[in-house]
C-alpha cells in the first residue's frame, strides 16, 4: 500500500512538471491586460538568519492597473490571495487573516518582512521597465536581463519566436531574495 502511494505521488509530480510552452501573443509592448498560470519558488536568505523557502502554484490576472494573484501549495491548497488596485491592496491568507494598505509593496513588507517589488511585477513579467530599468536583449531582440533598483530579472524562453513571452523568470536581489517563476500558460485578457 505504501509503495503504491509513493509511486502514485511520484507519477503525479512528474506529470505536473510536463507543460506546453507559453503561447506567442501579440508584441509585448501592445499587451495591456493578461493572465498567467504557473509555479513559483521563493528563497529568502537574510544575514544571520536561516534561509527560508516556499513554493507552489500561482494564478495571476492583470487588468486595467489592477492585479489578482492566487497562491496555492504544490498540491493546490489555497495559501493566499493578493488583490491590488490603484487605491487599495489587500492580502487574504488561507487562515482567514486579512491585511490592507494603499501601497502593495508596503503591504507585502508588513506581512512578510521583505520588501518585494509587487508594483513592478506586471511590467517585469512582460520584459518591460517598471520605471528606470536597464533592459538587455537576447540575440534575437527579446528581453534577456533587466536591472532596476538592485533587482535583477533573468528571462528564459521555451519558444524561439522573437515575439515569444518568457517561460521562466529568475528575480533576485543581492543574493538575499530569489523568486523563480515558471510560466506554463499566458493569456491576453480582452
Swiss-Prot record:
Signal peptide positions (record): 1-16
Keyword Lipoprotein carried by entry: yes
Key words of the record: Cell outer membrane, Chaperone, Lipoprotein, Membrane, Palmitate, Protein transport, Signal, Transport
Cystine bridges: none
Domain of life: Bacteria
Membrane topology recorded in Swiss-Prot or TrEMBL: Lipid-anchor
Bilayer-spanning residue ranges: none
GO biological process: lipoprotein localization to outer membrane; protein transport
Lipidation (N-palmitoyl cysteine): 17
Lipidation (S-diacylglycerol cysteine): 17
A single cellular component GO annotation: cell outer membrane
Subcellular location: Cell outer membrane
CDD domains xref list: LolB
Record-linked SUPFAM superfamilies: Prokaryotic lipoproteins and lipoprotein localization factors
InterPro entries named in the record: LolA/LolB/LppX (IPR029046), OM_lipoprot_LolB (IPR004565)
Statement: the UniProt record of this protein carries the keyword Transport: yes
Biological role stated in the UniProt entry: Plays a critical role in the incorporation of lipoproteins in the outer membrane after they are released by the LolA protein.
Binding partners and assembly: Monomer.
Stated family: Belongs to the LolB family.
Protein name: Outer-membrane lipoprotein LolB
Organism (species): Dechloromonas aromatica (strain RCB)
Amino acid at each position: 500500500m505504501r509503495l503504491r502511494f509513493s509511486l502514485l505521488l511520484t507519477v503525479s509530480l512528474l506529470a505536473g512538471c510536463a507543460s506546453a510552452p507559453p503561447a506567442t501573443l501579440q508584441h509585448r509592448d501592445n499587451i495591456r491586460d493578461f493572465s498567467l498560470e504557473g509555479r513559483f519558488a521563493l528563497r529568502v536568505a537574510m544575514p544571520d538568519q536561516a534561509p527560508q523557502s516556499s513554493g507552489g502554484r500561482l494564478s495571476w490576472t492583470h487588468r486595467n492597473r489592477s492585479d489578482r494573484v492566487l497562491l496555492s501549495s504544490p498540491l493546490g491548497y489555497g495559501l493566499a490571495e493578493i488583490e491590488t488596485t490603484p487605491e487599495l491592496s489587500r492580502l487574504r491568507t488561507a487562515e482567514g487573516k486579512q491585511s490592507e494598505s494603499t501601497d502593495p509593496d508596503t503591504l507585502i513588507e508588513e506581512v512578510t518582512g521583505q520588501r518585494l517589488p509587487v508594483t513592478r511585477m506586471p511590467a517585469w513579467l512582460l520584459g518591460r521597465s517598471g520605471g528606470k530599468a536597464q533592459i538587455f536583449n537576447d540575440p534575437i531582440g527579446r528581453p534577456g536581463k533587466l536591472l532596476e533598483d538592485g533587482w535583477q530579472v533573468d528571462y528564459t524562453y521555451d519558444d524561439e519566436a522573437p515575439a515569444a513571452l518568457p517561460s521562466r523568470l529568475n528575480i533576485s536581489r543581492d543574493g538575499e531574495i530569489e523568486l523563480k517563476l515558471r510560466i506554463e500558460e499566458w493569456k491576453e485578457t480582452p
